[in-house]
Regions:
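Flavin (FAD/FMN) cofactor-binding and adjacent substrate-gating region
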Residues: 2-10, 16-18, 87-94, 117-195
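Glycine-rich Rossmann-fold phosphate-binding loop(s) that bind the pyrophosphate
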Residues: 40-46, 66
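Glycine-rich active-site loop/strand segments that organize a redox cofactor
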Residues: 76-107
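Glycine-rich FAD pyrophosphate-binding loop
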Residues: 53-76
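A non-catalytic, amphipathic alpha-helix used as a structural packing/dimerization or gating element
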Residues: 99-117, 148
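Extreme N-terminal leader/targeting segments of oxidoreductases
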Residues: 1-36, 54-60
Length: 195
């Protein structure tokens, strides 16, 4: 379903500020002969197409998107490229083994840097800046959970070999009203996802 251009701009801050033409491309008018068809023009679909073409430049790739690139969650997110993961390394290790937990954390960290490198190599000015993220703990329960995350990160060696690692910042360093401390994760960047 094709929507009016103004409605795409109202989807999110990112669409409103991108400055590009948000007119949907025309529908397919026939069959295509391609090697790979990717359904969805979000970050995952675009990244997959880019990666395929980097690995095999002659590959015939098409991205099929009903609306516009970044229409769904990719264009309505917080603008973060982060190695934060909803499960701890301890939880991953319990289910998949220690090596898999370490590999996952390292892959998450390396992906943040790879996104920055890829954007620069492709000449995409997406306002990529990697400066980390701070997550505040405001009570004892949050402090204990944060300390467990830091300990798990250290125990699983994700900070070895110069790879970024999670740090605990005490209240003297945080100096935020009501905070008992915070974690700092250097493996986080901000970017403009609609660019």
């Amino acid at each position: 379903m094709v929507q009016a251009l103004s409605s795409y701009r109202s989807l999110s801050f990112w669409h409103d500020t991108v400055g590009d033409d948000l007119t949907p491309r025309s529908s397919l008018d026939g069959d295509l002969d391609v090697d790979v068809a990717i359904v969805g023009g979000g970050l995952t679909g675009l990244w997959t197409a880019w990666s395929l073409l980097q690995a095999a430049p002659g590959t015939r790739v098409v991205i099929l998107e009903r609306e516009i690139a970044g229409f769904g969650a990719s264009g309505r997110n917080g603008g973060w490229c982060s190695a934060l993961f909803p499960t701890s390394s301890t939880g991953l290790a319990a289910k998949h083994g220690r090596d898999a937990a370490v590999a996952m954390r390292r892959a998450m960290i390396n992906t943040v840097d790879e996104v920055g490198r890829a954007a620069a190599a492709a000449g995409i000015d997406c306002d990529f800046v990697k400066r980390g993220t701070v997550v505040y703990a405001r009570d004892e329960v949050q402090r204990r959970a944060a300390m467990a995350d830091v300990a798990a990160t250290e125990a699983f060696g994700a900070g070895l070999d110069g790879v970024d690692t999670l740090e605990w910042w005490g209240p003297d360093r945080v100096r935020a009203a009501g905070a008992v401390g915070a974690t700092f994760d250097p493996a986080c960047a901000r970017l403009h996802p609609a660019k």
